[in-house]
């Protein structure tokens, strides 16, 4: 289970040093084998391999006849990269994925249960500002009655 937010720096070889709390979960759930893919929100999604496999299976079963479904499948499955975390807990992010998410030196990791989102720092700050600007009237219907 991934939760919490952490900011980390890519090293000189564009490797992401996974924080210990996430690293331990990745080792337990997938032996350090991860899948990193693009998200429509222009961040990256990092899944332990066992968490990604059922998602990929569902995606590839979708019809290509619906253009929106096909586009989403192309994005999520097309950009997916299998990556092994090294013994120092680092993940080498492929150039195409770094470019997609506009990742530079600082990367924000956001735990989201079964996955971790990887954000460009400025884009993450904009995402937080947008989340804070919601009014009670603008909440999606699925959140009606939800309390913290």
UniProtKB/Swiss-Prot annotation:
Signal peptide: none annotated. Keywords: Cytoplasm, DNA-binding, Repeat, Transcription, Transcription regulation. Residues 5-51, 80-123 form the SpoVT-AbrB domain. It holds the Pfam family MraZ. Gene3D superfamilies: Transcriptional regulator MraZ domain (3.40.1550.20). Belongs to the MraZ family. This is Transcriptional regulator MraZ. The lineage of its organism: Bacteria, Pseudomonadati, Pseudomonadota, Betaproteobacteria, Nitrosomonadales.
